[in-house]
């Protein structure tokens, strides 16, 4: 590609449409009109703003209705094989944040990226769907300006372009968070499971850490700006929060476990392979068990407490299903507007939930640009890292003339959330990303054919200070015959456990006493 042509197309939203744009080094592009498709939010925004929908009487009966078709909902549905149920998903695709896209035979990760190679989740996937992950392997790399520091942790930070004093501060940081996370982990698991305290002193330490931001914790422990900078790059996509907005406890717990990817696996396109297998499995259990394009706007227990009425919008028509039990598998901040029966204290807790918008910018090249590391973190860019999309199939291979897609984590700061609605701003972020990659790999922009941003915002829970004490006790607190799955927090493995537990709770409500 000639430099004057820059990028032929930027594909954004969930529609595959081409945007002609000017070269990175040119003037700002003219406003661009597109027919992009956003995540379905308008009906929920209407609820938030006080709009009163006219609720129709029930015209359909099911034993169970599941709100959403993300990982938790799909696990719940799969574990209710003999139950007459339906999953109502507002998007046209299932899988929640675990989705992928395909370009010229290469899958791109659009959300959830990897998981442990050995776990009960993987045992389940192998047993039920003959689905096993491929090893990722290797270590994190880190780009500072134009210097690529490979094997950051394995080489004990020796490659950093800093003084020995600063390198020693990185080592102190890793030693401290590793020690703290190891000490707190057992009690944290008990806390996350909703069980009674085993070690009161450790529980107190957890709550104290949870009450302050990670930025504050870094400052109190006198870490230099170079360590803070690393955390500001690493935390948004990995912890789903910037340090200034995040619970110190959550950041320490997650960062304390980062070392290498030698026991971590994935599939081409990330964990979407598991979500797709689950959706197919649920569909095979019975016709009509997943209904996409169905935005739930009201979930209410009947006055006699024997049923739940679930009202949803599909094709601009409101419909109500009556069921014996409903599993809430959607975002909890939506639940407070949709479930009028929600107790005031639970509603108040859910009002404190914040989300971080994370998307993937996929840079599509007609040759291989970089294939030495799975995740390479970088500074001075809208994105936080880049990953070869087909790494698990071709990791480390030398193949210069082979087309390559670099999938980039893009966590958008909360203060810039409104900018996600601006086409020209999205294009600008894509251009800045391509320009930064070209600084690191000179001439790479000449081989860039296309940039894809499938969804502008996957909403991930921002574990803000106080989340563990003020919010978490309520996320799985059921409301009558409405089972709250607690789907908002945790990994794909956590989604499995939450889905199975929700299925059991719904089954209990099907028993006629």
Regions found by a protein language model. Give the residues of each.
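N-terminal export signals
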Residues: 5-26
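Conserved flavin/dinucleotide-binding core of flavoenzymes
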Residues: 27-53, 57, 152, 373-377, ...
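Mobile amphipathic helical/loop "lid" adjacent to a hydrophobic cofactor/ligand pocket
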Residues: 34, 133-244
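N-terminal Rossmann-like FAD-binding beta1-loop-alpha1 element of flavoenzymes
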Residues: 63-86
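Glycine-rich FAD pyrophosphate-binding loop
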Residues: 81-101
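Conserved FAD-binding subdomain of flavin-dependent enzymes
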Residues: 106-136
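Active-site/ligand-binding neighborhood in enzyme catalytic cores
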Residues: 192-299, 305-307
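Mid-domain catalytic core of redox enzymes
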Residues: 292-407, 411, 440
């Amino acid at each position: 590609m000639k430099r004057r042509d820059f990028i032929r197309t930027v594909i954004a939203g969930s529609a595959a449409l081409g945007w002609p744009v000017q070269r990175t080094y040119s003037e700002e592009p003219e406003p661009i009109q597109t027919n992009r498709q956003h995540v379905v939010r308008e009906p929920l925004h209407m609820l938030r703003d006080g709009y009163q929908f006219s609720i129709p009487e029930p015209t359909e009966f099911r034993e169970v209705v599941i709100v959403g078709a993300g990982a938790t909902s799909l696990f719940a549905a799969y574990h209710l094989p003999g139950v007459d149920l339906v999953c109502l998903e507002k998007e046209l695709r299932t899988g929640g944040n675990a989705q992928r896209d395909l370009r010229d035979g290469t899958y791109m990760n659009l959300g959830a990226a990897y998981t442990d190679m050995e776990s009960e989740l993987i045992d389940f996937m192998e047993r039920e769907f003959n689905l096993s992950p491929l090893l990722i392997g290797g270590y994190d790399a880190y780009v500072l300006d134009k210097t690529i520091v490979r094997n950051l942790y394995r080489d004990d930070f020796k490659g950093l372009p800093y003084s020995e004093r600063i390198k020693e501060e990185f080592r102190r940081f890793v030693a401290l968070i590793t020690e703290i996370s190891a000490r707190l982990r057992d009690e944290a698991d008990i806390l996350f499971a909703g069980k009674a305290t085993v070690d009161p002193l450790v529980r107190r330490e957890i709550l104290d850490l949870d009450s302050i931001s990670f930025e504050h914790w870094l400052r109190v422990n006198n870490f230099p700006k170079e360590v803070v900078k690393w955390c500001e790059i690493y935390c948004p996509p990995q912890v789903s929060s910037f340090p200034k907005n995040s619970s110190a406890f959550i950041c320490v717990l997650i960062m304390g476990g980062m070392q290498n990817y030698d026991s971590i696996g994935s599939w081409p396109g990330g964990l979407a392979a598991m979500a797709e297998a689950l959706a197919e499995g649920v569909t095979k259990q019975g016709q009509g068990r997943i209904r996409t394009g169905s935005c739930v706007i009201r979930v209410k227990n009947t006055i006699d407490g024997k049923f739940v009425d679930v009202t949803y919008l599909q094709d601009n028509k409101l419909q109500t299903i009556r069921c014996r039990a409903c599993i809430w598998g959607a975002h909890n901040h939506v639940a407070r507007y949709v479930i009028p029966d929600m107790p005031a204290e639970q509603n108040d807790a859910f009002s404190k939930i914040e989300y971080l918008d994370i998307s993937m910018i996929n840079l599509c090249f007609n040759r291989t640009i970089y294939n030495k590391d799975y995740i390479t973190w970088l500074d001075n860019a809208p994105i936080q890292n880049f990953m070869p999309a087909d790494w698990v199939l071709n990791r480390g291979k030398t193949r210069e003339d082979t087309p390559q897609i670099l999938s980039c984590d893009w966590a958008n700061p909360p203060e810039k959330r409104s900018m996600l609605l601006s086409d020209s701003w999205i294009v600008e972020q894509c251009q800045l990303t391509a320009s930064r990659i070209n600084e690191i790999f000179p001439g790479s922009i000449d081989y860039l054919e296309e940039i894809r941003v499938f969804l502008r915002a996957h909403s991930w829970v921002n574990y803000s200070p106080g989340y563990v004490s003020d919010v978490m006790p309520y996320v799985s607190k059921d409301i009558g015959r409405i089972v709250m799955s607690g789907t908002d927090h945790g990994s794909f493995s956590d989604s499995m456990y939450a889905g199975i537990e929700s299925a059991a709770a719904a089954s209990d409500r099907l028993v006629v006493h």
